[in-house]
Amino acid sequence: VIVAVVLVGQRRWRAFAAQVIPYAMLGVGVLTFCTLNYTHYGVFALSDFSEGSFAAAMGAMMRVDTDSDKPYLSVPADAREKIYEAVPELKPVAYWLEEDAQMENDFRDPGLDDYRAGSFYWAIRRAAQYEGIYADAQTAANYWQTVADKINAACDAGTLPSRTGKRVATSQPITAA
């Protein structure tokens, strides 16, 4: 912003344009992509992984306190068990994550006997797909928002133990060791 003010003040329009055009092009590209997602799927978002209800659900799941101190686990097994008890909407997905041999073979880390953070996202999405939650984008968005709202409400009420405040993210909370 300071560079732009100086360049405009000195009437160096070409230099100003050289600074602004790349950001404007990026903004137009992102806006175009979001608009295309809205027209095709009914959800105005760049990706459901980085924003919106899926990120809200992942952030809520990672909010639940766990007894596990293993690194790389965003939602360890003990946290998932607590969540399944509090959120009945996740019970059908629980079968796929906890009992289906093929799902475990595809996504679980045998050394940890659990889902690493990166594979958990894809495993829970596949489980949701098997349950018909991804029939269309709006159904999926509504489902994940309901899951996020119920987990956050349970954490706020003290029904589920919470290790952080409300968050919308697919990345694990960063803590100083």
Tell where the protein language model's regions lie, with residue ranges.
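Hydrophobic residues in alpha-helical segments
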Residues: 8-9, 39
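Transmembrane-embedded, aromatic-rich helix segments that form part
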Residues: 1-7, 48
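Generic secretory/membrane-interface signal
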Residues: 4, 22-24, 36
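Juxtamembrane membrane-water interface segments immediately following transmembrane helices
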Residues: 27-177
